[in-house]
Amino acid sequence: MVDKRESYTKEDLLASGRGELFGAKGPQLPAPNMLMMDRVIKMSETGGNYDKGYVEAELDINPDLWFFGCHFIGDPVMPGCLGLDAMWQLVGFYLGWLGGEGKGRALGVGEVKFTGQVLPTAKKVTYRIHFKRIVNRRLIMGLADGEVLVDDRLIYTANDLKVGLFQDTSAF
């Protein structure tokens, strides 16, 4: 039985990375440094732009985050691909929250637009995931649109984020 809460702390997210939150067969979040959120502040099976589920999470920004030291020297900015990965992470987390089992894998995205950036002077990144469809058959898959905001300003959008849960990834 999955512990379906509306919010999760950093410790909860770290437990997910160790395979402890959604059970031995549930999907895991990555461990730091690839874990791209500090907390999940809202999870719901309704709501969002399509009323089919909604997730909101946050990442606290500080100049000491690992990517600012290498991307780019003298011009630090969070790589856009990390924001995209965070959205995929949250789609997979939601599938586990619903009780889905398997190893999460990003399957694609329809379109991504970057209209801003995350600098070391920012305070907070917010991720918003709006679910469009959940497939729960032999393959468990989530389809969603996502938004990334920095200090409450929209900077990335992604349409048709796809994540699947697989029992066996050896032939993937």
Curated annotation (Swiss-Prot):
| Keyword Lipid metabolism among record annotations | yes
* Record-listed E.C. numbers: 4.2.1.59, 5.3.3.14
Reaction catalysis annotation: a (3R)-hydroxyacyl-[ACP] = a (2E)-enoyl-[ACP] + H2O; (3R)-hydroxydecanoyl-[ACP] = (2E)-decenoyl-[ACP] + H2O; (2E)-decenoyl-[ACP] = (3Z)-decenoyl-[ACP]
Q: Say if the entry is tagged with keyword Lipid metabolism.
A: yes
Any Gene Ontology CC annotation: cytoplasm
Molecular function via GO: (3R)-hydroxyacyl-[acyl-carrier-protein] dehydratase activity; trans-2-decenoyl-acyl-carrier-protein isomerase activity
The UniProt entry's GO biological process terms, in alphabetical order, are: unsaturated fatty acid biosynthetic process
Keyword list (alphabetical) reads: Cytoplasm, Fatty acid biosynthesis, Fatty acid metabolism, Isomerase, Lipid biosynthesis, Lipid metabolism, Lyase
Any idea where this protein resides? Cytoplasm
Q: Which Pfam families does the record match to this protein?
A: FabA
Pathway(s) this gene product operates in, as recorded in its UniProt entry: Lipid metabolism; fatty acid biosynthesis
Query: Which residues are the active-site ones?
Result: 71
**Protein function:** Necessary for the introduction of cis unsaturation into fatty acids. Catalyzes the dehydration of (3R)-3-hydroxydecanoyl-ACP to E-(2)-decenoyl-ACP and then its isomerization to Z-(3)-decenoyl-ACP. Can catalyze the dehydratase reaction for beta-hydroxyacyl-ACPs with saturated chain lengths up to 16:0, being most active on intermediate chain length.
The UniProt subunit note reads as follows: Homodimer.
Q: Which PANTHER family does the UniProt entry name for this protein?
A: 3-HYDROXYACYL-[ACYL-CARRIER-PROTEIN] DEHYDRATASE, 3-HYDROXYDECANOYL-[ACYL-CARRIER-PROTEIN] DEHYDRATASE
Question: Could you tell me which NCBIfam families the record lists for this protein?
Answer: fabA, PRK05174.1
State the similarity comment. Belongs to the thioester dehydratase family. FabA subfamily.
- Its recorded name reads 3-hydroxydecanoyl-[acyl-carrier-protein] dehydratase
